[in-house]
Amino acid sequence: MKRRDILKGAAAAATLGFPAILRAQQYKAEYKMSTVVPPAFAWGKGGEIFANLVRDRTSGRINIKQYPGASLVQGDQTREFSAMRQGIIDVLCGAPVNWSGTVRQLGVFTLPFITPDHKALDAVINSPAVMNDYFDLVRKAGAEPLAVGETGFRQISNSKRPIVKPDDMKGIKIRVVGSPMYGEIMNGMGANPTFMSWADAQPALASGAVDAQENPLEVFLAAKIQNLGQKFVTKWNYSNDILLFAIANPVWQSWNAQDQKIVRESAQEAAKQQIALVRKLFSEDVEKVRALGVNVHVPTPAEMKEWQIATRRTYARWKVQIEPNLIGKIEQVVEGTRKG
């Protein structure tokens, strides 16, 4: 065989083999997943379950490594979505309220009392009319949404006094995540909100730089917030964000269809397990917090009405600003649970 023919054959073989080689090279050795908290918390546990399922089901082809403490963004969870867009983060497992400063529409689930109980939340996250629209928003923002879990109902704790009614919030210095809407809710009741990452919040509570914080009681327990001077809790259930599992668009598009299916199904299974864990912890949290010597106030129905009235103006203003059509669909679904 002539040398020229040999070279032609080699070139043809290389050309035929190139796409397969390229596809193999597109898979990274590691995909970085950011979570605000480690697996000791239900939220972080959901991320761990997801990463393990993907690794096992792809035989290690897709290796997702969890980075808790929002360490990929120096502890500032509000920067996670921007960092994903920049290629610093590949996978997100977090509360969209943290990213609503970057993409306002992601915060639709955190309007005050929009999902007042688990029955309402379940109806919303299982509604195709709601979730198809929400997932479209996430895609347009730069990520492929896979599944939703639950971060848990957020409760107030403070070091000063029992908080029974909205007037009790006056003058309280409260740490909130970087959501302008959360800040407005607290301002509307006379509190003094300060935006702070979770990494900065704990020393601020310990030093007395802030008096209060709001988080699920599961977080209160896991982080031992009672040791940071927090003596009083009000279980008012004012906000319950989803836990969104999502992949950066360029990463998602680099995977073949079979692996995309595996990753999506793994996220759905992880979300299911994570929700079950959050619900179990929710059913036990008041008893466990009280056992630590913390005063826990559970509002009566009449008191809950006062809280809802106190946040109504903020709700109306932010409904218009965020995504009124989608929020209208959420309201319809929730109303259906009241009639059922």
Where are the predicted features?
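An acidic, glycine-rich surface segment that forms the CoA-thioester-binding/catalytic face
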Residues: I125
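N-terminal secretory/targeting leader peptides
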Residues: K2-L121, A129-V130, D136-G340
